[in-house]
Amino acid sequence: MQTSQFHWHYFEIQPAKGGRFGEFVDRFQDRPTVPFVVFNASGKKVVIPPGLYTWYQFSNEYISDPSTVISGSARYRTGGFYDGDYKSIEFTGAFRAGNRILGSTGWTHQIIDLRYGNFHNDLIPMKLSYSFTTLASIQALVQYNNQTAQVSSNIRLALLNRSGTGLFVVYNDRRDTYSADPQQVLGRSFIIKYTRLVDF
């Protein structure tokens, strides 16, 4: 598979009080050499055949001042997707409590219409982070994807030094919500990583 992407942010307004509004366009090109599945859920499968595909997507987005207690963003995207049509809307809301607690949640809804089939996808992420100090923090992400009918979670503890290296402790979990057992665990991992910068 050979892919390329071009991004052009041709219009943007940045108010003095923070945030921004803008428009941009993305150009995609893909040359799959074998058929691949782009959607497979609820007994429905959509397959992209081999070939050369080029398409464009145009986006409008608004992002409010992220330094305020409550902030948000909205994005609308429309254009092509391989040899079909694509539309999506995305909303995100965030809050902060002092300098330590940050949280956000969002919703992305995609509508894709191809010659080989139509489908939609919903993605719902929720994030929460707490900073003990400027170098120590814990972050949690829980995300639902209706295409795969899965809930994934990620929890990361970071204890860093001033060079940005240090100790990372990460827990990952994936669960299936579509099977007969709605809490079937598809995978778990527990990772401990330590990095240190060495001068020679």
Locations of the language-model features?
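Exposed, low-structure sequence patches enriched in small/polar residues
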Residues: 1-200
